[in-house]
């Protein structure tokens, strides 16, 4: 079993820890808790780079090894890093579990060393009709991020 972890940091007071597990070549399970967010939906993505030298802005675009447009996690045409939305309660906290088959922890398309990013706004899943829908899901600014590392 492969395991990964990302500790989220933010200049806006958002904190969290995200865990990743994968059995063999199976799906990857993503689970975590994020706090300090406004209630509602927030876009949640794996970005291409594990670079936080300029905060979350230097994490690059969504992880997209197949060169597809943005979409929902269940869509055939989507970035590998498109994980949809997390739901934040009235207390500012989201606790979630997501399973996905396009974010392996091993192999040539591994997400280890890349970043996970929480966005300010809901991800429209590529269906919003906004000019940014098919690129970013029009999910707004990057409010927290962390580099995905291997966990023992």
From Swiss-Prot:
Listed binding positions for Zn(2+) are 62, 70, 79, 82
Q: Where in the cell is it found?
A: Cytoplasm, Cytosol; Nucleus
Query: What Gene3D superfamilies has UniProt attached to this entry?
Result: Superoxide dismutase, copper/zinc binding domain
Q: How is the cofactor bound?
A: Binds 1 copper ion per subunit.
SUPFAM superfamilies tied to this protein: Cu,Zn superoxide dismutase-like (SSF49329)
List cystine links. Answer: 56-145
Q: What class of enzyme is it?
A: oxidoreductase
Q: Which reaction does it catalyse?
A: 2 superoxide + 2 H(+) = H2O2 + O2
- Binding of Cu cation occurs at 45, 47, 62, 119
PROSITE patterns recorded:
SOD_CU_ZN_1 (PS00087), SOD_CU_ZN_2 (PS00332)
Q: Which terms does the UniProt entry file under GO BP?
A: cellular response to copper ion; cellular response to light intensity; cellular response to oxidative stress; cellular response to ozone; cellular response to salt stress; cellular response to sucrose stimulus; cellular response to UV-B; defense response to bacterium
Tissue specificity comment? Expressed in leaves (at protein level). The spatial localization is regulated by miR398-mediated silencing. Mostly present in flowers, old rosette leaves and inflorescence, and, to a lower extent, in cauline leaves, stems and roots.
Its GO CC terms are: cytosol; nucleus
Q: What does UniProt give as the signal peptide span?
A: none
Q: What is its cofactor?
A: Cu cation; Zn(2+)
Keyword terms: Antioxidant, Copper, Cytoplasm, Disulfide bond, Metal-binding, Nucleus, Oxidoreductase, Zinc
Report the EC number(s), separated by commas if there are several.
1.15.1.1
Subunit organization: Homodimer. Interacts with DJ1A and CCS.
Function according to Swiss-Prot or TrEMBL: Destroys radicals which are normally produced within the cells and which are toxic to biological systems.
What the record says about family reads:
Belongs to the Cu-Zn superoxide dismutase family.
Q: What is this protein called?
A: Superoxide dismutase [Cu-Zn] 1
- State the organism of origin: Arabidopsis thaliana (Mouse-ear cress)
């Amino acid at each position: 079993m492969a395991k990964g972890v990302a500790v989220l940091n933010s200049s806006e007071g958002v904190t969290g820890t995200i865990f990743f597990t994968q059995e063999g070549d199976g799906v990857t399970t993503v689970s975590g808790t994020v706090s300090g967010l406004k209630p509602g939906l927030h876009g949640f993505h794996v970005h291409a780079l594990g670079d936080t030298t300029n905060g979350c802005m230097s994490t690059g675009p969504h992880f997209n090894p197949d060169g597809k447009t943005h979409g929902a996690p269940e869509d055939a045409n989507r970035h590998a890093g498109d994980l949809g939305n997390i739901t934040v309660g009235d207390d500012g906290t989201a606790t979630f579990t997501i399973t996905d088959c396009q974010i392996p922890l091993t192999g040539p398309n591994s997400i280890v060393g890349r970043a996970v990013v929480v966005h300010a706004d809901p991800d429209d899943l590529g269906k919003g009709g906004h000019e940014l829908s098919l690129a970013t899901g029009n999910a707004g600014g990057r409010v927290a991020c962390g580099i995905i590392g291997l966990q023992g």
